[in-house]
Amino acid sequence: MKIIPALLVKTPEELESQIEKLSSYFQHFQIDIADGKFVPEKTITLEEIANIASLRTQPLLSFDFDLLVSDITAALNGIDKISQQIKVDMIFIHNLDSFNPKPNAGIAIDPPISVDTIKQEFDLNSIPVIQIMSVIPGAQGRAFIPETLYKIEQLRNAGYRNKIYLDGAINNQTIPLIMEKQFRPDILCIGSYLTQAKNIEERAKILGKI
């Protein structure tokens, strides 16, 4: 199971600091982009990320973007520009009204959204990747919602064969709940359990055993 640190930051300095602390252990990151409209919280912007010179000097790093924004078109255009400077892997879209499947653009299923709704709206296997949110998105530190884990089983039973991410409140208390399930995610996106850790090396070793 792959581990990707999830970075929810407000400033370029905070982003650089977190990447610097974690890049000895991880080379793939997910950055949350929130516009203060789709969710109340507001994060670093794509324009600010594009101006971080230090990211352009680290070619081994790759980045996912988790888009909690109303204007998906503008965000995708911004990521297109960023992709000329850094390696962009997957993009996750929460605003399903604006989603059109692309090779590197998948969806994020927020807790209120059912798998049945996704099946009605989309051809499942046209979606290259799906991220299941195990918290209400927008801020780190929110409570884990165990019922969201059943969506993994529902997707697999519906014939979905592409990768499934899980994001939200993943830590030493919730990982056992995830691992006891027959159907598990392919990738765990882990936020404050890593970014706020006093001993990142110890936590990275624990996660490496999953």
Model-derived features: where do they sit?
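Catalytic beta/alpha-barrel core
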Residues: I4-K10, H28-K42, P59-F99, P103-K119, ...
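Alpha-helix N-cap and loop-to-helix initiation/capping positions
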Residues: K10, E14, P40-E47, Q140-K151, ...
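Catalytic cores of alpha/beta
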Residues: L15-L22, D71-S83, P112-N125, A169-L188, ...
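Conserved, mostly hydrophobic/aromatic
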Residues: L22, D32, I79, I130, ...
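A short alpha/beta connector and helix-capping loop motif
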Residues: K37-R56, L60-L76, I175-T195
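Alpha-helix-loop-beta-strand connector modules within alpha/beta enzyme cores
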Residues: K42-F65, N104, A108-P111, T148-I170, ...
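Glycine-rich phosphate-binding active-site loops on the catalytic face of alpha/beta enzymes
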Residues: N95-D97, Q131-Q140, K181-L207
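Positively charged, amphipathic and often flexible ligand-engagement surfaces
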Residues: V129, R142-A143, E147-R156, L188
